[in-house]
Amino acid sequence: MTGKTSKSATKNSRTLVTHEFPALFDSNSRVLLLGSIPSPKSREQGFYYGHPQNRFWKVLAQVLGEKLPETIPQKKAMLKKHHIALWDVLESCTIVGASDTSIEDVVPNKISELVQATHVERIFCTGATAHKLYQKYCAEDVGIDAEKLPSTSPANCAVSIEKLVEAYRQIL
């Protein structure tokens, strides 16, 4: 996708966001992790879970027994090594900042096409909003119900890193 976020948007205004980077997968992918839509920091970096306080990469590295990946190529390699695909439920939406609870005007990604091109048998959503959106817009078409994982977002700081690691172990 080549859509852009409105440059005139302020922190509290509703912005049309179009997913700007592709799903990460290959034909050997067996597990699919789905977020909702990339955060402003992720869109800046051009890759998933780019906010420095988001605990996604730290949690995944611990679950997979890997060194914490620091670069985008290292992150991609870690996921591919463990047959994990990564994408977001939404192709586009309107949103206020990074607040998943403000998401409206949704256009879902074609997740069924990714699943058909892979060996994905299990789908996990990285947060309640991603799970709700997947179940509402995608589950029937895909034919796989998703399991809900706790969000690794800094907004979900009440959940400790230890609890996140424990919850994410089910992807193995």
Model-derived features: positions:
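Short, surface-exposed acidic-centric catalytic microdomains
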Residues: 41-102
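Hydrophobic/aromatic beta-strand patches that form the interior of the parallel beta-sheet core
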Residues: 32, 85-87, 124, 147
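Short loop/turn segments at strand-loop or loop-helix junctions that form parts
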Residues: 36, 89-91, 151
